[in-house]
Amino acid sequence: MAINATEKPLGKVFTPDYQLSIPSFQRAYIWKPENILQLISDLEEACKSPETPYFLGSLILVREGDTSFSVIDGQQRLVSLSIIIAALRDLEHDEEWMRLLDALIVEPGDKLRGITSQPRLTLRERDAAFFREYVQEGNLEALFDMNDEDCSSNAQRNIIANTKQAYDALAQLDEEERHRFASYLVNSVTLVIVTTDDLDGAHRIFDVMNMRGLPLTPSDVFKARAMSGLPAAAVDTYASRWDDIMDPLGDDAARVEEFFRYLHLILTHKPATGKLIEDFLSDVLNQYLAGHSIDAFIDGVLAPYAMAWRILERPSDTVLPDDVRGRLEALNDYRHHEWK
């Protein structure tokens, strides 16, 4: 396994040298407004000392081709940085600055050199077209007019909320301040780019280095482990299937963890030990992995129990009889939810 690590400013990452994509087995974009606003605030403070670089952690990439890479760690930051650059671009009045900022998030293409126009960063399949159309290609006005019903995933809702907040925060700066911010972002914000040609090796590196980003949730761990037990040809299909099942449960990590804790109890009749990830893997998921039947777990266990959980969580959204809905709504008013 060949590993290469090099430190680069952001302006040398968002270039034709790195065509980045988020694999389908990765978790969704989960940053909230407070996360992106904190990043903007940190960068505003840092750019007051332009001679001092701002280190934004590492990216772990798997090389898929000469300039094509899958992102194993760094998705949340890369998406958020793209949002910030898109907001800066749309706030800009100078055409040259607009062109330069736009080229950071969308490769403009070069027919002479055979370079096609495409986004620098491609999200997971379910969110890629949305992110490209509204953020990367500069349709922020249309994005700001959207509401939750216009979104097909929690990631898209997070993209809308974070883009609005980033735009409003950067709009508070005058033109000179935004130019100084953008210049610092491109030239002084640095990342350590760790590349390897081996997916398993990339995950081992991630396990060692994942200290800066948001911690993985149990659902993230279970999904990644489940995908590892599928044939390569089935990974994209079942990664999308997993997302279709879990996305309606929301992205509140505590509530999703509660779902898996109760699922573990139902399937094993064992009380919680406080080690959900370890227990669920050993008591439930590993049996399906050993039997090469992860598809049976996803279709026959995860899907129906997630549907039942949604009914218990939001009975008003169901077509259950009125008296049943009323009783479930009353039960949801209790502080303790062990009845589920």
Q: Could you describe each region identified by the protein language model?
A:
Residues 1-72, 76, 179-180, 191-192:
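Short alpha-helix boundary/capping and kink motifs at helix termini
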Residues 97-139:
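Extended charged low-complexity segments that act as oligomerization/scaffolding linkers
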Residues 49-51, 91-95, 212-216:
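Secondary-structure transition/capping motifs at alpha-helix termini
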Residues 43-47, 92, 170, 174:
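Hydrophobic, Leu/Ile/Phe/Ala-enriched alpha-helical segments that form helix-helix packing faces
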Residues 40, 82-85, 206:
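Short, amphipathic alpha-helical segments that act as regulatory/interfacial helices
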Residues 122-340:
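Polyanionic (Asp/Glu-rich) segments that form extended negatively charged tracts
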Residues 77-94:
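Short active-site loop/helix that positions an aromatic residue
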Residues 72-75, 82-84, 101, 193-195, ...:
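Glycine-rich, histidine-containing beta strand-loop boundary motifs that form or position
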